[in-house]
Curated annotation (Swiss-Prot):
InterPro entries: AhpC, AhpC/TSA, Peroxiredoxin, Peroxiredoxin_AhpC-typ, Peroxiredoxin_C, Thioredoxin-like_sf, Thioredoxin_domain. It is an enzyme of class 1 (oxidoreductase). It catalyses: a hydroperoxide + NADH + H(+) = an alcohol + NAD(+) + H2O. GO terms for biological process: cell redox homeostasis; hydrogen peroxide catabolic process; response to oxidative stress. The keyword Zinc-finger does not apply. Keywords: Antioxidant, Cytoplasm, Disulfide bond, Oxidoreductase, Peroxidase, Redox-active center, Stress response. It is found in: Cytoplasm. It holds the Pfam family AhpC-TSA. Coiled coil: none annotated. PANTHER family: ALKYL HYDROPEROXIDE REDUCTASE C, THIOREDOXIN PEROXIDASE. Its EC number is 1.11.1.26. The active site is a conserved redox-active cysteine residue, the peroxidatic cysteine (C(P)), which makes the nucleophilic attack on the peroxide substrate. The peroxide oxidizes the C(P)-SH to cysteine sulfenic acid (C(P)-SOH), which then reacts with another cysteine residue, the resolving cysteine (C(R)), to form a disulfide bridge. The disulfide is subsequently reduced by an appropriate electron donor to complete the catalytic cycle. In this typical 2-Cys peroxiredoxin, C(R) is provided by the other dimeric subunit to form an intersubunit disulfide. This is Alkyl hydroperoxide reductase C.
Length: 187
């Protein structure tokens, strides 16, 4: 079942951010754009490369009014341990949510019930708490955060410009389309 267009289900969680443990709920997503980046496990292989890449794009996402949350089924304590022991992860300044109950991973339909780990899933959530994009990758395939920045820009553009759509390879300032009878068969 697709989660696009669905409101994020209620959750409460603990996260590690900037040397502190914080509380995060679905209500924190309201009023701003958010990105949820699920990954299988701390102290693994592809995950630290993805999270470091996401940190490298964090300033660009913040400029767009986006808050970033990474999520795994590890606890917030494990996130702190990983942050304190990994050169790549020590750079992270966005919230690292612990989901040991698997509630959030299940709510976003990324939980692998067999392993108890989250799949690699990325979700862009609008200021109303509604999921606008979903990307799920196989465990061995890392994500590119620069593509994520462009997807956020496209989602924001479409929200601000009802009736327009962003075609493939759209970049900010690029040409958009206005679906109409006139365009049928001409693209």
């Amino acid at each position: 079942m697709s989660l696009i267009g669905k409101e994020v289900l209620p959750f409460e969680a603990k996260a590690f951010k900037n040397g502190e443990f914080i509380d995060v709920t679905n209500e924190d997503l309201k009023g701003q754009w958010s990105v949820f980046c699920f990954y299988p496990a701390d102290f693994s292989f592809v995950c630290p490369t993805e999270l470091e890449d996401l940190q490298e794009q964090y300033a660009a996402l913040k400029e767009l009014g986006v808050e970033v949350y990474s999520v795994s089924t590890d606890t917030h304590f494990v996130h702190k341990g990983w942050h304190d022991s990994s050169e790549k992860i020590s750079k992270i300044t966005y919230a690292m949510i612990g989901d040991p109950s698997q509630t959030i991973s299940r709510n976003f339909d990324v939980l692998d019930e067999e392993t108890g780990l989250a799949d690699r899933g990325t979700f862009i959530i609008d200021p109303d708490g509604v999921i606008q994009t979903v990307e799920i990758n196989a465990g061995g395939i890392g994500r590119d955060a620069s593509n994520l920045v462009n997807k956020v820009k496209a989602a924001q553009y479409v929200r601000q410009n009802p009736g327009e759509v962003c075609p493939a390879k759209w970049e900010e300032g690029g040409e958009t389309l206005t679906p109409s009878l006139d365009l049928v068969g001409k693209i």
